[in-house]
């Protein structure tokens, strides 16, 4: 057993509890040595963006790769690639050209914190060298041109756009390249073979062998034609065709049917099929063909497409070659050859790879294989947007070249940067892949940045995605987590990068393996893509090794090609690679589930997803039973403040820590206090260091939300008992102890932001003021002289936060009034109260106020003079109706909170905290929660092992005795059942000398109400419980009178609209079944949309009279109008046959009001806010 903070790499000893990096001492049950630490978990985002902008970090990486002789790394940044690609822009005659080079960034205008505060975008100005050349005179003009503000990525892998943090999700798309497929023909028993080349952009090239064995080609998705016609058009003669393809019957048959003789005939034939109705000429046909596949402006395979075609077809064309991105005749010939060989049933072909002859496997492709799907990460997604913007700009430049005077032209006059800026803005603001960051807790942010989505532009759509795309594929191993994916319509389309996965320069996901030679496993690590992996034999990480790192057994289980994803046994000497770690196949969130190997996959999926919904609590507590992944997750999520350089702390305050580094420099670390996250949670940092303390690089300065001593801490360790209690925990309901409420164990702080602006209206400017008409002084008591609530005020629903008045329309004045007005000056204008009030169901304490004013030179949207933001924080204690969950997909709702004295208690008098239903375990098959409970008890009570039992020999590093501690049981390499039972038998005894729980994991519990023992022993232990972001306070809702829908006049629905509850079809059936006619009539009329009736009823209730007869519902009138619009004349008749006049709803209100004597001139609330 190894003890370490993050992984079991250092096989030495446990990190000291008093070590400077604040890591808690975790005792690990891992038995497998791992040669590789978990990599930086945000590299997926940061590396990609570094490549795009070509910053110093990226340059350092390139220099290192070149030094190591790795040639696959791109040596030019993404932006410089695009500018090089678009240059030169020439006018239509080719007399002038404009080219761009050397993009570089100036310093950002605001820091990230200022951007969040001001609702600005965190960006830096981009400048490019532009060179205009007049080819006639040879004159050159150079200028540095501003190309707009370019959003920058923060250190945490996010973007700040308009003041909110956003994440750009990586996209999983089909890779450009050559693909071969076989489909059964519907009309005959033959198979149809198809091949296609998919470019990064440009026309598709498709080949097909039909049931008559004719080889056809389809250019640019148009009509099919004979492939020999194409070959002749490309300059081949019949003799050459026969020489190359003579041995294949299908090609000979196709050639016999081909009527064209010469190259010209073939070109004209192709032109007629592609452009029917246009007069064909040889020149037009030639240029059409060239533009389709051989012109780099129109067609681009991208490096990855060229790489895939080279590998598939055995072509040896350099990737750096200028012409590599377009098709060549040899590509088309190799493509045809591969397809006819596949059709003829051949198994191999000879091709070239890396300059050597290579046997190519002739087989069809699996679209869902990760060798054929690649990742478009942030850098590439933004690059594509900039490319779109620049190509729009290119058109403008061309037009301006022709219209402007040649002498006066400078690069600046030609360029219009609007399309570029617009394209970037559009991407960050509206793209499906640029998402509002999930900041529920550090793990949810980390997972969001590591998400892989098959949706989005150029990807799949939910409705069209079949089962195959969503399914787990053997090639996902170590690349995409088979467990973490959403439930619902997106299942399988959105995944999460596996913990050790990384992305190579072509966009394929690689995963690391240890090299094995002749049965000896080395610590040297090599990264393989899914394609490379298909060729080799790979052993699992848990294959037993002896002390010389040799396989302990003769035969080893490996994953091999042709095994159909099933493992096979091979001799140890044949194994070539071995997994680096047992948790290699799962994502970070899944790797945080202890005893994952004992949980059913469906429940593990829920467990991984629910950890992301855990709310940060007032006090975080690390789990007794972890997996050793907690530290890496918390640190890489970026919500913990860590030391960038080694040094000594010189100054500490709540908001700032200053360190004097060993190299003589000083670093300031800002500490967040009670900030609001995107999800309205409280993101607060707590300083852990003291003045004079020394820290090494990576040492922890402050804990963030849901972290404890630098470890992820999403919930609380609670004492659970698995038993039923009076049926109150039926169907996953949970019983909780009052102690949890009283001691704020599961309390969390939530911060809401309320904002109001004062604008210019047609009738005059709105004003933020304390002087509000018809409002009593006690209502205004909390407001200061500006009319804004003061910090620290306790507010309830309906209280005024910011006083604001809006001018009302003035009525036409009589001549007398005008005269008086002229003599005595202006009477006070009519205004109405439009103050910002606390919404329904919310309350709390005001913790912050921000005022932005045009007069103080704050940037505000047009028409806005002032903007006020008020932050209200509320402490939410746990209450019945809140949702709790464990880490194994075991979730439930609190049904009852019992007084401490009524809770079942242990023999030493300790009451349990939470009672769960034991029936929640067997059917769900998540036994991991039971093992966690037992091991949690062991970790909390500590142990003392006597003698040398068999199970201890597996764990040489386990301390023989220990007090209360935390343990790690890594995924697929954790504590075994016999180890847990052994430790349960060795737990420390109480002061009475009793061991409360023995190896069965069960104990006698006593009923808190009677003090009697329960008849059977009950499982008791510590489980880690999370409070999820589904709080009953956010869901509970009641309506008195509120807004109505415009057309039907029925109450709106939903909490957001302050709506009513829908009395639906089934509820109506229930009333019909009881014959409750009057209740039903009320629901259809006066309680809903009988306008006249509801006004009358209101009055009757106020005056204490009987309820009047209901009238005609408004929706019935709408129905009649709809039928009239279909030209059906509908009349409503009374019982005596006379026609009833349907008055319009507007009239009905006024008539009703008149009859009732109600004054309707008072302002009625028109919106939810005003209610």
UniProtKB/Swiss-Prot annotation:
Q: Which Pfam families match?
A: RNA_pol_Rpb2_1, RNA_pol_Rpb2_2, RNA_pol_Rpb2_3, RNA_pol_Rpb2_45, RNA_pol_Rpb2_6, RNA_pol_Rpb2_7
Keyword annotations of the record = DNA-directed RNA polymerase, Nucleotidyltransferase, Transcription, Transferase
State the top-level EC class. Answer: transferase
Say which domain of life the source belongs to: Bacteria
Q: Which CDD domains match?
A: RNA_pol_B_RPB2
Could you tell me the EC number(s) of this protein? 2.7.7.6
Keyword Transcription annotated: yes
Q: Which reaction does it catalyse?
A: RNA(n) + a ribonucleoside 5'-triphosphate = RNA(n+1) + diphosphate
The GO biological-process annotations, alphabetized, read as: DNA-templated transcription
Molecular-function GO terms, alphabetical: DNA binding; DNA-directed RNA polymerase activity; ribonucleoside binding
The subunit structure is: The RNAP catalytic core consists of 2 alpha, 1 beta, 1 beta' and 1 omega subunit. When a sigma factor is associated with the core the holoenzyme is formed, which can initiate transcription.
> What HAMAP family does the record tag this protein with?
RNApol_bact_RpoB
Similarity remark:
Belongs to the RNA polymerase beta chain family.
Return the NCBIfam families for the record. PRK00405.1, rpoB
Function (record text): DNA-dependent RNA polymerase catalyzes the transcription of DNA into RNA using the four ribonucleoside triphosphates as substrates.
Q: What is this protein called?
A: DNA-directed RNA polymerase subunit beta
Origin species, per record, is Arthrobacter sp. (strain FB24)
Gene assigned in the entry: rpoB
């Amino acid at each position: 057993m190894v003890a370490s903070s993050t992984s079991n790499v250092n096989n030495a000893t446990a990190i000291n509890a008093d070590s400077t990096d604040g890591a808690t001492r975790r005792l690990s049950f891992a038995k497998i040595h791992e040669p590789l630490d978990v990599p930086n978990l945000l590299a997926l985002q940061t590396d990609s963006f570094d490549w795009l902008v070509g910053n110093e970090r990226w340059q350092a990486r390139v220099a290192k790769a070149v030094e190591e002789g790795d040639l696959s790394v791109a040596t030019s940044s993404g932006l410089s690639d695009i500018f090089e690609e678009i240059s030169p822009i020439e006018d239509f005659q080719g007399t002038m050209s404009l080219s761009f080079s050397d993009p570089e960034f100036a310093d950002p205008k605001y820091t990230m914190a200022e951007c969040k505060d001001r609702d600005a975008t965190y960006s830096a100005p981009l400048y490019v060298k532009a060179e205009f050349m007049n080819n006639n005179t040879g004159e050159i003009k150079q200028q540095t041109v501003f190309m707009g503000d370019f959003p920058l990525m923060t250190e945490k892998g996010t973007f700040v756009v308009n003041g909110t943090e956003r994440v750009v999700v990586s996209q999983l798309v089909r890779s450009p390249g050559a693909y071969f497929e076989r489909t059964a023909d519907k009309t005959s028993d033959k198979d149809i073979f198809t091949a296609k080349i998919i470019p990064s952009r440009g026309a598709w090239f498709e080949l097909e062998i039909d049931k008559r064995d004719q080889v056809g080609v389809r250019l640019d998705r148009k009509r099919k034609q004979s492939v020999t016609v194409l070959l002749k058009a490309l300059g081949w003669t019949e003799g050459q065709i026969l020489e190359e393809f003579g041995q294949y019957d299908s090609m000979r048959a196709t050639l016999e049917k081909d009527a064209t003789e010469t190259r010209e005939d073939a070109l004209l034939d192709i032109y007629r099929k592609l452009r029917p109705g246009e007069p064909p000429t040889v020149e037009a046909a030639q240029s059409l063909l060239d533009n389709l596949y051989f012109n780099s402006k129109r067609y681009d395979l991208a490096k990855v497409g060229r790489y895939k075609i080279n590998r598939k077809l055995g072509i040896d064309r350099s990737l750096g070659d200028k012409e590599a991105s377009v098709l060549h005749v040899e590509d088309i010939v190799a493509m045809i050859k591969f397809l006819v060989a596949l059709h003829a049933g051949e198994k191999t072909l000879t091709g070239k790879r890396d300059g050597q002859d290579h046997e190519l496997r002739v087989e069809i492709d699996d679209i869902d294989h990760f060798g054929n799907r690649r990742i478009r990460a942030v850098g590439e997604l933004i690059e594509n947007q900039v490319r779109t913007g620049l190509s729009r700009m290119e058109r403008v430049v061309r037009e301006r070249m022709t219209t402007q005077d040649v002498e006066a032209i400078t690069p600046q006059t030609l360029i219009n940067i609007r399309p570029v800026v617009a394209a970037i803005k559009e991407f960050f603001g509206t793209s499906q892949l640029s998402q509002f960051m999930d900041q529920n807790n550090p793990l949810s942010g980390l997972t969001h940045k590591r998400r892989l989505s098959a949706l989005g532009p150029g990807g799949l759509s939910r409705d069209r995605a079949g089962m195959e795309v969503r399914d787990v594929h053997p090639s996902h191993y170590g690349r995409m987590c088979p467990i973490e994916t959403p439930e619902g319509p997106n299942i399988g389309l959105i995944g999460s990068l596996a913990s050790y996965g990384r992305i190579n320069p072509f966009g394929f996901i690689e995963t690391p393996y240890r090299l094995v030679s002749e049965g000896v496993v080395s610590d040297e690590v090599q990264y393989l893509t899914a394609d490379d992996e298909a060729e080799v034999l790979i052993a699992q990480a848990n294959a037993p090794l002896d002390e010389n790192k040799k396989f302990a057994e003769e035969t080893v289980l490996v994953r091999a090609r042709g095994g159909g994803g099933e493992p096979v046994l091979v001799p140890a000497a044949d194994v070539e690679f071995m997994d680096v770690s047992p948790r290699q196949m799962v994502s970070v969130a899944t790797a945080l589930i202890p005893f994952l190997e004992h949980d059913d996959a469906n429940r593990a999926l829920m467990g991984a997803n629910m950890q992301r919904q855990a709310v940060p609590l007032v006090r975080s507590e690390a789990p007794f039973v972890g997996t050793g992944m907690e530290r890496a997750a918390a640190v890489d999520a970026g919500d913990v403040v860590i030391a960038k350089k080694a040094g000594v702390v010189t100054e500490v305050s709540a908001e700032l820590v200053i360190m004097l580094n060993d190299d003589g420099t000083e670093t300031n670390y800002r500490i967040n206090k009670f900030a609001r996250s995107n999800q309205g949670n409280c993101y607060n940092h707590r300083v852990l260091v003291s003045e004079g303390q020394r820290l090494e690089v990576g040492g922890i300065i402050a804990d963030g939300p849901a972290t404890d001593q630098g470890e992820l801490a999403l919930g609380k360790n609670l004492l659970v008992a698995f038993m039923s209690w009076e049926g109150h925990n039926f169907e996953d309901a949970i019983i909780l102890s009052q102690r949890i409420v009283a001691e704020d164990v599961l309390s969390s702080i939530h911060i809401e932001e309320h904002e109001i602006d004062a604008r210019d209206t047609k009738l005059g400017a709105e004003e933020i003021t304390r002087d509000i008409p018809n409002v009593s002084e006690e209502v205004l008591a909390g407001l200061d002289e500006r009319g804004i609530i003061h910090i620290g005020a306790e507010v309830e629903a309906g209280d005024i936060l910011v006083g604001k008045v809006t001018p009302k329309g003035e009525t036409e004045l009589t001549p007398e009034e005008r005269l008086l007005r002229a003599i005595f000056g202006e009477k006070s204008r009519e205004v109405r109260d439009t103050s910002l009030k606390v919404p329904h169901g919310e309350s709390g304490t005001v913790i912050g106020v921000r005022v932005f004013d045009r007069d103080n030179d704050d940037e505000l949207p047009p028409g806005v003079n002032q903007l006020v933001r008020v932050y209200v924080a509320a402490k939410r204690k746990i209450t019945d109706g809140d949702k709790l969950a464990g880490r194994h997909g075991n979730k439930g709702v609190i049904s009852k909170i019992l007084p401490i004295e009524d809770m079942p208690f242990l023999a030493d008098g300790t009451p349990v905290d939470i009672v769960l239903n034991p029936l929640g375990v067997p059917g769900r098959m998540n036994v991991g929660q039971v093992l966690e409970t037992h091991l949690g008890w062991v970790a909390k009570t500590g142990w003392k092992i006597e003698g040398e039992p068999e199970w201890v020999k597996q764990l040489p590093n386990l301390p023989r005795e220990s007090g209360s501690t935390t343990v790690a049981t890594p995924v697929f390499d954790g504590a075994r059942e016999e180890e847990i039972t052994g430790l349960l038998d060795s737990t420390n005894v109480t002061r009475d000398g009793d061991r409360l729980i023995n190896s069965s994991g069960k104990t006698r519990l006593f009923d808190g109400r009677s003090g009697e023992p329960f008849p059977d022993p009950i499982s008791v232990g510590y489980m880690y419980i999370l409070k999820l972001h589904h709080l009953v306070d956010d869901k509970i809702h009641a309506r008195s009178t509120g807004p109505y829908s415009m057309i039907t006049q029925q109450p709106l629905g939903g909490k957001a609209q302050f709506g009513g509850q829908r009395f639906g079809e089934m509820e109506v059936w229930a009333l019909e079944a009881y014959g409750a006619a009057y209740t039903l009539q009320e629901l259809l009329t006066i309680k809903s949309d009988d306008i006249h009736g509801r006004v009358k009823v209101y009055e009757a209730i106020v005056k204490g009279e009987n309820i009047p007869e209901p009238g005609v519902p408004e929706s019935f009138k709408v129905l009649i109008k709809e039928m009239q619009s279909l030209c059906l004349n509908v009349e409503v008749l009374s019982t005596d046959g006379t026609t009833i006049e349907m008055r319009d709803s507007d009239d009905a209100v006024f008539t009703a009001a008149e009859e009732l004597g109600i004054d309707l001139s008072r302002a009625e609330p028109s919106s939810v806010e005003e209610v």
